[in-house]
Amino acid sequence: MKKKIFLGLFAAIHICGLSIFTSCSKNNDEKMLGVDTTNRVDNYSDMDNLVESLPFSELQGISVGNAQDNDAQTGVTVFFFPEASMASAVVLGGGPASREVPLLDPQRNTQPLNALVFSGGSAYGLAASDGVVTSLEEHGYGYNTGYGLLPIVCQSCIFDLSYGKSNIRPDREMGYKACQNAIASNSPLSGNVGAGTGATVGKPGGMATAQKSGIGYAAARLGQLEVGVAVVVNALGDIFQDGVKIAGMTTIDRKGFVSAEQAVLKNQYSDLIAGNTTIAAVFTNAHLSVADLQKVANIASTGMARSIRPVFTMADGDTVYAISLSGGMILSDVNTVGVLASLVMEKAIADAILASKIADEEYLHNI
């Protein structure tokens, strides 16, 4: 009998809780919970006005450089931090190609980053960081070990060997050139440039029904808080903007779209889905701990999930970094930074697609 009474009481509370914003003496309940309703805004339609679009190039504490081989269709993008910056990362895909990412774990002896490298070439492309380290050392950047400078560099690569020439990959020389360019000037260019040169999307059916993608950028300001995102979109899945598919798997004649999710569910192309990765970095002026930065990267990944379908699969190496630029000067809640980053992530992914569109003839020539 007591059990029935308890269950009935729980159900009544649950029903009331579900309607707390519509009935059950809403205002009285809120006052009992200690919520100040005096200046509450019930209509959130004006919330978008609080967020201001910001050119990525206006972010302070970061400079971007690129280098690519347009014949081989592969390249490198270097994010250089004149003042070494704290960072963390989350690896969400099943097949990453990366350098020094474990160093960014909050449980490690984390050191500030001098540069972050994105490249093509899959595991071969990791050689690009050797050139980046050399460039940084030449310019006097790095952790002072007492025996010389040790530049702290992390890297993630996309698999672009199926586009262009697979026997030519980013190497030490290309990495050196991209870093030299980053130190000399700030060039956050979108589309088929740098690490985005060989990026493609929508590949459950192979390259013949995939489409070109690239690298994209977006940034926003909320009060004094600034958040920017750079992303190389090289996904297995389709790409959506505001719920509308803008790139991805096509029909055989390339005149229409096919759902990448449905293709995976039907398991029609299980032998052709390896070799994908979307790599992104969130940059902010917020002062955050390494643990908080890792959480920001995690929350920001929800922007990927809204834009890429499917995402984080075993056939992807999806990775998200989060960097507090120049140590970060703005105090902000980690949730605010993460949610804003997730929204900016969507914008950057769309930018990567819209800035990299090419004619089908050119695309098919490179596969």
Task: Report the location of each language-model feature.
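Bacterial N-terminal signal peptides
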Residues: 10-19
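Bacterial Sec-dependent N-terminal signal peptides
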Residues: 19-47
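Bacterial N-terminal signal peptides that target proteins for export
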Residues: 1-10
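A structural signal for small-residue-enriched, beta-sheet-centric alpha/beta enzyme cores
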Residues: 41-123, 127, 138-367
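Active-site catalytic microenvironments for nucleophilic, acid-base chemistry
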Residues: 135
